[in-house]
Amino acid sequence: MQGFIKFIFTFFTTASVFCSNLLFPATVYPESENFDFSYLEYPEEAIITLEEAGLTEQELVGRASAELPEYVQSGGYDDINGITISPYYTARVSGEEIPVYASVVFIRVDDTGTLHSFSEIYVDSTEEFSFNIEITGADVELKNAVVLPESHGVEALCKDNTVTASINKTGVYTFLFNNANQYYGYTLMVREKVDEDKEIAEYIDKYGEDNVWVLDKGVYQYDYVNLVAHNNLVIYLREGAYVLANHLYDINCVEDEDKYLEPTALGDNAIGLTRYPFINFYNCNNITLMGRGVIDMTRLDRRERRGVVFTNCNNVNVSDVKIINSPEWSFISYCCTDVSIDNVDIIGNRGNCDGFAICNSHNVTVDNCFARVADDTFEVKALGGTMDSKNITFTNCIAWGGYARCFGITGEVNKKISDITFRDSAVIYRDGIWDNDRIGSLVVVAEQTEGSIDGVLFENIEIFRDEGRPVLVKIYDEEAENFEIKNVVFRNISYTSYMKPKIAGTDSDTNTVQVELDGIATRGKKRSFPKMLFTIGKHCDVTSE
């Protein structure tokens, strides 16, 4: 049945994209006079083409194939970095060619890899602007295109192997080509132009030169970076700063994960890690990690290290950086308070390279971020520890899930989780269906149930395509007793999916699952009786507006 439904939706997508492009071609608007912009460009010594690396596209993306042994598929390599020149496209903004980069990502539905292409430009948003981007196929013949999220209201015109779209505001724009094929995605990040010299000078005036560490454009290699008990510290990665993690330990099987210990690591983090994260902050206050640089962990083996980790920290600000191909959990906030994350992008193809994991933290905002990873993308957890998870808000974020879940409460609920918001965000694709009682696009899934969940809002979220469940609320631990999931609200949610959304408790009537549905739309049409769209299990209180 699911295969038939998928066929129908695939046919519907193909037909609608084709007809829309044929019958209602997009309008290309006049550009602003003297439109001024700059673009992200990485140093030549960091970025090489596939040809220069002696690789074909198939050889590179084949490294992510699930047909390989797990620790080979997610292993590291050093013959090419995690960002390369995209072989798929060239791009122009206002007639000027801009770099198109690419990183390996994972497609779960086919258990294989592909390249996700991207560019980034900087504009002055204090002035009205309009520009046209032209994307021309190189290895890919372009026949039609759709621009996501649909809420941007941007349409694409395809003619003679070139796609053109008019853009007039900052944001993250993802182009799907050839009947919304997820193999050849391209994302344009349009972000605010900044004066790096001015920003750095202001930080030096505020904190002193010794407390402002600047990495200029260039390549930097570290075994790991360990920062303990720092206060009022700024780490500034200028545009084009390329930070590489050195591979030290061969992790070829699960036994190897515990084979290599770094003796002082356990005392320098609060999460129980026996090897340092690649960038580790512990017991720090008023910390800023920012700039248009990249943190690339492609050389590390599976689970050799975690990515960027903050534990027991206060007043944390992270902005503008890109995190590439972490071997495990890309970004972690654990037992932290007052955390701001803005304009951070995470791309990765390995299993367990979760995107943004906010754990046991208070007063956290995640805004304007993009993640395409082979695991959970934007998640809240409550692990063991003294703190619960409270007052955490995600806004204007874009998720592309190549394996598991996109937005929500995922797995560990060992303390109370409360006052969580996911708003004004979008799912491009989510294609994992390996356990449809555990994964989905928007989820509240409790696998460990020592705590409780009270107050989760999903609002104004669009899901372009989900191969499984678009919404899942589930007590996954069937042995749970006296566990509460309450005050969960789904408001103004639109989706297209191959399975029904689901809300389910357990056989025990001691557990509570309470959900409100308010404004649910499928395939672009708001439904009058949203409860009828859902599979609803035992001991669930579901209301609808």
Segments (PLM) and residue ranges:
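Hydrophobic core
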Residues: T13-N21, I235
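Short glycine/acidic-rich loop motifs that flank beta-strands on beta-rich extracellular proteins
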Residues: D223-N226, A245-L248, T298-R306, P327-S333, ...
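Right-handed parallel beta-helix
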Residues: N232-V234, E239, N285-D296, N314-N325, ...
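Extracellular beta-rich repeat passengers
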Residues: V413, G432-E545
